[in-house]
């Protein structure tokens, strides 16, 4: 389910444009928190599975690297489970480091987390139709939502914006 944030602020003081700006900042905050491996409750994400698995070469979101080729050659075996698959297959550039559990493998899901709606009354952040599986991921590792720290930052941002208008 998408996350909805509603405001009880006089319409003369708060516009859809204000909500859109705040929604963009909130979205960036969620993505940053997620990249640090922290869930919507401010806790570290549950570790990735170490149960051995096979990943098909065809149809995988990200081409499997590392691991052991299967007897048929159509898949790759990872003794260390999804944790090993992710570690071996993810892009390792010279950029910044992220947490081990950051919910990014190909980048598809997190890049499809968007501001879906912004009105004077609030905004909605959710996943596009291309990454609906992210809602199932959210059941195990709650990333869609606002941590207590996120709520404080959001409240302070609204307060600062309103003080500037009064």
Where is each model-derived feature located?
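Short, Lys/Arg-rich flexible segments
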Residues: 1-166
């Amino acid at each position: 389910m998408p996350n909805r944030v509603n405001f009880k602020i006089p319409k003369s003081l708060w516009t859809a444009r204000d909500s859109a700006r705040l929604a963009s900042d909130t979205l960036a905050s969620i993505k940053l928190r997620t990249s640090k491996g922290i869930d919507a409750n401010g806790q570290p994400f549950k570790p990735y599975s170490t149960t051995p698995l096979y990943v098909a070469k065809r149809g995988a979101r990200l081409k499997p690297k590392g691991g052991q080729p299967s007897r048929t050659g159509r898949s790759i075996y990872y003794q260390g489970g999804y944790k090993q698959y992710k570690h071996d297959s993810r892009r390792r550039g010279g950029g910044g480091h992220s947490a081990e559990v950051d919910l990014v493998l190909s980048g598809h899901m997190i890049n499809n987390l968007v501001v879906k709606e912004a009105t004077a009354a609030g905004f909605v952040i959710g996943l596009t139709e291309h990454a609906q599986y992210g809602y199932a991921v959210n059941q195990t590792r709650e990333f869609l939502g606002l941590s207590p720290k996120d709520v404080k930052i959001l409240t302070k941002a609204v307060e600062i914006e309103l003080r500037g208008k009064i």
